[in-house]
Amino acid sequence: TNNLNQYLLDKIDPKLNDYESIICNPINVSGAKKIKMIKRGWRNLIKDPLILFNKQKETVAFHFDMHHGHNNLNKAASLLEKKDKNDFIYYINNHNFYNPHIMCIARPEILEKWFNSLFSWLKKCEEVFGFDNLKGYDTLRLYAYLAERYLSYWFKKYTKYKEQPWVSLNL
């Protein structure tokens, strides 16, 4: 189509005024193929073999371990401020969905709090993980993957949120 603007969100539907933030619809991380879980999640399976038979145990943390480096998410979570650390660790170890794409719509004062929390945490993560050893799909974009998981937790804890599709086109 010639006019991209007709597909862009340029104003918020008044029905959404009761919400403080809009985040993308969640995606479910459970349901990985057994062979992939064995190949990429073997360390987790040694600790808890029931993961193979219980989709509820295929948590955000398990998925992250399989795709972005074993224990990286838990290591990063331990660097959070005290007020968020335990709740975030609970979230990643007990949920099997997250809101992807690091996309949100919120008022400036909420975004300022979000970015302050996020970037102070990521700065601590940089001191632990650095950049030199982050290579390949698994870890090259580690900080983006961490931010993506944290967004789901943070906006649900600190705002009255609404989940929406990140795209809706009627072509």
Language-model segments: residues:
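ER/Golgi luminal nucleotide-sugar-dependent glycosyltransferases, focusing on the catalytic module
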Residues: 1-171
